[in-house]
């Protein structure tokens, strides 16, 4: 839960007000210049209009060097960040041939599979030689290899569902699947902080969409009771079906879903549960099986389980795991399955190999070690950040930990200074977050050593003092018992 102090809120609003005022003033003079030069083609309306276009031109471009930084190596614990420069006040960024070796705190490489792996990489290279980079076809027309069917069976076994279906892109998994599950006459109840892919999927479904307060089973029950009592708009007929959509770990908050309580509410009102485990599958739980394992939930109680391969497994794509009837329905009706080229075979092999390492089926215990390390690293880093006085969102065991920045001036200051000290962080602002709630999102990996984390904490602490984002008093250092006895 964000605890935004009043003074911070006022200074943040004042900063945005100044930026808006100066932006409007610059736009006024730009219109005068364009009118005299007759620059615009007569009769054509401007393509880009509105406040979002204004935000991009007058606010985002000032700090765009803090986003989309290209890299020149695998996104391991350390990677090479390409240096860029601008000759036109940040409107255009140009790459140089120079790179900076930085500690990586931005990638979703939770288990460290994104870099070369002694077990996975040789198998991926072998699959590339055998199957080529692409099937050049859709799943229903020559695009299904032995690897695709093997991965579907393996995913179903791993998450504890009867069947699974693969997709070549994680975002599409949500945005294309949801309209196939519910349509006109149906009701979607979505967490207020669900990912944009869920939002777009719900909008495109034609179903009625209602939102409940973030991670609040009590408010979810209120919304369900109200909607069931009222029925469909205008006709007041009963809903054809109701689907409640939540995430395992919320990617911008680092919070775990209150899954047991939400499932209890859904069962009470006969609503289906749709769980997005993009950031939790493979990253949490004793054996990496996500929030169901971590929170003691039977996978059979979750009707539809979604996940991606881009985080813990070091690949690309996504999956849906559910009953055989639902999966068969999706294979025959989902455009992303019927019309899109199937997942790249080497990418499929990477996921197969990664899951086998996690399960210990590679003949080693590296998977268990990775899971223990990501849990230990995450909890250590979160605890130390809080001790320093930062406002850190999220729960224990979550590898995602946002550090609140708030003020727009602190976004580039924090990002650029960390990069200067060779720590690469991701800063997130509007429209990915509410306007007043800008943050830096730290992602921890099992590939980080304790020395890496201590270095990162040292840099972040110094930059935090410089930028002024330690919103709470730091804990005093603990005196060892022996030293305490000496003092006495």
Swiss-Prot record:
The chain crosses the membrane at residues 4-24. Heterodimer with LCB1. Component of the serine palmitoyltransferase (SPT) complex, composed of LCB1 and LCB2. Belongs to the class-II pyridoxal-phosphate-dependent aminotransferase family. Disulfide bonds: none annotated. This is Long chain base biosynthesis protein 2a. GO terms for cellular component: endoplasmic reticulum membrane; serine palmitoyltransferase complex. It catalyses: L-serine + hexadecanoyl-CoA + H(+) = 3-oxosphinganine + CO2 + CoA. Its EC number is 2.3.1.50. Keywords: Acyltransferase, Endoplasmic reticulum, Lipid metabolism, Membrane, Pyridoxal phosphate, Sphingolipid metabolism, Transferase, Transmembrane, Transmembrane helix. It is a single-pass membrane protein. Its main location: endoplasmic reticulum. It comes from Oryza sativa subsp. japonica. InterPro entries: Aminotrans_II_pyridoxalP_BS, Aminotransferase_I/II_large, AON_synthase_class-II, PyrdxlP-dep_Trfase, PyrdxlP-dep_Trfase_major, PyrdxlP-dep_Trfase_small. Pathway: Lipid metabolism; sphingolipid metabolism. It holds the Pfam family Aminotran_1_2.
């Amino acid at each position: 839960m964000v605890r935004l102090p009043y003074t911070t809120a006022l200074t943040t609003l004042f900063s945005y007000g100044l930026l808006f005022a100066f932006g409007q003033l610059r736009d006024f003079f730009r219109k005068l210049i364009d009118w005299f030069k007759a620059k615009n083609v007569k009769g054509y309306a401007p393509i880009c209009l509105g406040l979002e276009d204004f935000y991009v031109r007058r606010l985002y471009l000032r700090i765009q060097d803090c986003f989309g930084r290209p890299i020149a190596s695998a996104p391991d614990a350390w990677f090479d960040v390409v240096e860029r420069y601008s000759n036109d006040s940040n409107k255009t960024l140009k790459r140089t041939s120079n790179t900076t070796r930085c500690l990586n705190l931005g990638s979703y490489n939770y288990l460290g599979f994104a870099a070369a792996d002694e077990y996975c990489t040789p198998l991926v290279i072998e699959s590339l030689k055998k199957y080529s980079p692409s099937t050049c076809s859709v799943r229903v027309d020559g695009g299904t290899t032995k690897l695709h069917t093997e991965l579907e069976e393996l995913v179903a076994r791993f998450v504890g569902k009867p069947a699974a279906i693969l997709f070549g892109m994680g975002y599409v998994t949500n945005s294309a699947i949801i309209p196939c599950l519910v349509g006109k006459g149906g009701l979607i109840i979505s967490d207020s902080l669900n990912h944009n892919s869920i939002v777009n999927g719900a909008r495109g479904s034609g179903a009625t969409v209602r939102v409940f307060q973030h991670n609040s089973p009590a408010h979810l029950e209120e919304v369900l009771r109200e909607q069931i009592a009222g029925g469909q708009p205008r006709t007041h007929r009963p809903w054809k079906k109701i689907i409640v959509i939540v995430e395992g770990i919320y990617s911008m908050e680092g919070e775990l879903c209150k899954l047991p309580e939400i499932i209890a509410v859904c069962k009470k009102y006969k609503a289906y549960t749709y769980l997005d485990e993009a950031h939790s599958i493979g990253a949490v739980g004793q054996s990496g099986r996500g929030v169901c394992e971590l929170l003691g939930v039977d996978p059979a109680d979750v009707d539809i389980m979604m996940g991606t391969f881009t985080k813990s497994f070091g690949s690309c794509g996504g999956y849906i795991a559910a009953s055989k009837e639902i999966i068969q329905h999706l294979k025959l009706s989902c455009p992303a399955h019927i019309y899109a080229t199937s997942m790249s075979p080497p990418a499929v092999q990477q996921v197969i190999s990664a899951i086998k390492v996690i399960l210990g089926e590679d003949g080693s215990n590296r998977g268990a070690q990775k899971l223990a390390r990501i849990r230990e690293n995450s909890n250590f880093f979160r605890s130390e950040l809080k001790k320093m006085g930062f406002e850190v969102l999220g729960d224990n065991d979550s590898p995602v930990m946002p550090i609140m920045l708030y003020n727009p001036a602190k976004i580039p200051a924090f990002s650029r200074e960390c990069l200067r000290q060779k720590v690469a962080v991701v800063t997130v602002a509007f429209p990915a977050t509410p306007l007043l709630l800008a943050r830096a999102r730290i992602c921890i990996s099992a590939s980080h050593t304790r020395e890496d984390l201590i270095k990162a904490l040292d840099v972040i602490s110094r930059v935090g003092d410089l930028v002024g984002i330690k919103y709470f008093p730091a804990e005093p250092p603990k005196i060892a018992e022996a030293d305490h006895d000496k003092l006495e």
